[in-house]
Amino acid sequence: MFQFHAGSWESWCCCCCLIPGDRPWDRGRRWRLEMADTRSVHETRFEAAVKVIQSLPKNGSFQPTNEMMLKFYSFYKQATEGPCKLSKPGFWDPVGRYKWDAWSSLGDMTKEEAMIAYVEEMKKILETMPMTEKVEELLHVIGPFYEIVEDKKSGRSSDLTSVRLEKISKCLEDLGNVLASTPNAKTVNGKAESSDSGAESEEEAAQEDPKRPEPRDSDKKMMKKSADHKNLEIIVTNGYDKDSFVQGVQNSIHTSPSLNGRCTEEVKSVDENLEQTGKTVVFVHQDVNSDHVEDISGIQHLTSDSDSEVYCDSMEQFGQEESLDGFISNNGPFSYYLGGNPSQPLESSGFPEAVQGLPGNGSPEDMQGAVVEGKGEVKRGGEDGGSNSGAPHREKRAGESEEFSNIRRGRGHRMQHLSEGSKGRQVGSGGDGERWGSDRGSRGSLNEQIALVLMRLQEDMQNVLQRLHKLEMLAASQAKSSALQTSNQPTSPRPSWWPFEMSPGALTFAIIWPFIAQWLVHLYYQRRRRKLN
């Protein structure tokens, strides 16, 4: 009988085309060889895992629990000896009883399944074990088993990361919009709101005015372009707002000079965009003697039930007004904003630089614009949202009082502007062209803004220094009090030469009192005996 070995006679016959390679008996033999290979893989992994467990030191950094060792023991016995056929140990062997229970609980599990379970339990604790030669050998035999974990969680992790990235990007966009545009007042359905509310104020405006048409994609692009140049949402004031100049510097309107409707293409594009979004554009021409307002989408008077109420959300606004008061008190360009006369007409007093356009040449053709969100009317003495939120008082000048109210709703502000003598008056325009000349327009608005920031920074530094001074004084007082307490502590009665912690009197009492007690007991028994006798 010839004995054929794999890879010798059969392979030679297949190469010589004597025996076809796809015969049924050949395929069955290949299947048996593959099963043997798979069995050998499980066995090699099992043997490597057993070596790792056996090589663990008794006092090493990794100490498996008793339950874990019982699992490994039961799987090892099942993989090597098969199902448990031994009798249960007696009560005097509790460890043997625990082992027998763990082994018999596996039932009729096959050896291959026990090997696989042993290796799977090893994978759970493989990361916590120290890296040794046996562990490296086991890792080499097992292979990259972490791919399964990554494949299971890859879809969820990608979804979570995408959602988080979207939320973060949205928050960053909202924060950028808030930082790019300072709080500017705008009116929606006769109520004034500020533009620092971001997305929520837009949603509120949409709820209050549902009939307003939604802007198209082209309109949105135009609004983004106009917002890049500067925010157009400002309100014309008569000079009584302290913060209007600083906010107007950041929101100045860059337009070209025009007279009787002659504007450049830039202004026309902005006007068309504002017509689509339902905004009110107010143009002030200095060559017109009568007060008028060119309103595109209608005029609506500002009314509110809480005109006399004043609200403030934070103390930061009071600090901003105090810094502005100190800055305006000096002789500078800010003196114009508080030195005006309330009885003086708006057109003759001139407008602050917050609503000036491009610096002109002093001619009366310079055009000023004020854009107000929605339908509204800009009154004399109108204040913007960022300046009135921190003013809990009424200003009365020359018999004329102004009531301010700023109500926080969501993240936006509401305010109502009232003036007793001129509630029905609108923003007019005068012919005083000197106020609109290049002298005031050419002043660097950036210098004033930097000066204001420096003043606020200086105030913050002063506050920090005051706090540090208070902390130093508190620490010094605590040190003095602790020193006084230590000096006032009573001195111990024991002398310096005494070696024990107890005082000499306490030590002598502790030694003598047993003898005294014994003597008293002895006296008691003596008297008792005498009485009995």
Swiss-Prot record:
Pfam families: ACBP
Residues with PTM N6-acetyllysine: 470
Family, similarity comment: Belongs to the ATG37 family.
Name of this chain's protein: Acyl-CoA-binding domain-containing protein 5
Coiled coil ranges: 448-478
Residue numbers spanned by region Disordered: 182-227, 339-443
Function field: Acyl-CoA binding protein which acts as the peroxisome receptor for pexophagy but is dispensable for aggrephagy and nonselective autophagy. Binds medium- and long-chain acyl-CoA esters.
GO CC, one annotated term: peroxisomal membrane
Entry binding sites for an acyl-CoA: 53-62, 73-77, 99, 118
Membrane topology: Single-pass membrane protein
Domain ACB, residue spans: 42-131
GO molecular function: fatty-acyl-CoA binding
Biased composition (Basic and acidic residues): 208-227, 374-383, 432-442
Tissue expression: Highly expressed in brain and liver. Lower levels of expression in spleen and heart.
Chief localization: membrane
Transmembrane segments: 503-525
Key words, A-Z: Acetylation, Autophagy, Coiled coil, Lipid-binding, Membrane, Peroxisome, Phosphoprotein, Transmembrane, Transmembrane helix, Transport
Cell compartment(s), UniProt: Peroxisome membrane
PANTHER family the UniProt entry points to: ACYL-COA-BINDING DOMAIN-CONTAINING PROTEIN 5 (PTHR23310:SF6), ACYL-COA-BINDING PROTEIN, ACBP (PTHR23310)
UniProt entry tagged with the keyword Lyase: no
Family annotation (SUPFAM superfamilies): Acyl-CoA binding protein
Phosphoserine found at: 194-195, 197, 201, 244, 314, 429
InterPro entries tied to this protein: ACBD5, Acyl-CoA-binding_prot_CS, Acyl-CoA-binding_protein, Acyl-CoA-binding_sf, FERM/acyl-CoA-bd_prot_sf
Any Gene Ontology biological process: fatty acid metabolic process
